[in-house]
Amino acid sequence: MAKQKGPLKYVGTIGDIRHFKIKGQEGFFAGMVGGPTDTQVKTAPEFQRTRENMSEFGGCAKAGKSIRVAMSEVLNGMTDPQCTGRLTSIMKKINLEDGTEARGERKVEISTQRTYLHGFGFDKNISFASISYVPYLLNHSVDRLTSNFTTLTATPASSINAPAGATHFRYINAIGVVSDFAFNAATGTYEPTNPELNELSNTTYGAYSPLNAAYAGEVLDASLPVGTVMTADVSVLQCIGIE
């Protein structure tokens, strides 16, 4: 893919060259117009591998979207422009781990590959660790219905890397459920194996604390509905943040 570095900045097609912007990236890009028709991609034998890739990419995108939906309340204003793409990329890595299904129908089995998501930052430019230096503990209930986020005592002036002009801060603890995804031959698409639990979530907010006074610490519990039974094909995620 070519990238324009000259003084001309425009988008659109000139001759056989298409000029465009990519969200989250600087500069203007260019590529040749053309390629196979939609019908060719969908039916021609030589595009079988392309169809398989498209099918699995769609499943990975759906799985990534479910994570974003489950954590949507805490993610408001806390993601970078490439967050969606980065999550889809992780889902694809998980998808490639499946050795039980045919290519084009491989599962997105998050429940067996959870380590891929451990430590994922929704904003790669500003991490939680770069903002808060307050010691904390994370715990989870055996039934996977409650996530605990406990912060310890601290001096905010030296423990919180707050933006200029800020006077207060608060912590956020979120819990969310994401199902594994499998290809449904009847519909020709990927679907959650447990749609009832998929995207179930809850978010708890701490009290606003002043930056110029001692912080006593607090306990934030985020819980899912009592009586909910977590199955083996779902993963329960915990996300913490500060604002």
Task: State the predicted function of each range.
Residues M1-I126:
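Long, polar/Ser/Thr-enriched low-complexity segments
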Residues N95-E243:
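Charged linear interaction tracts used for macromolecular binding and regulation
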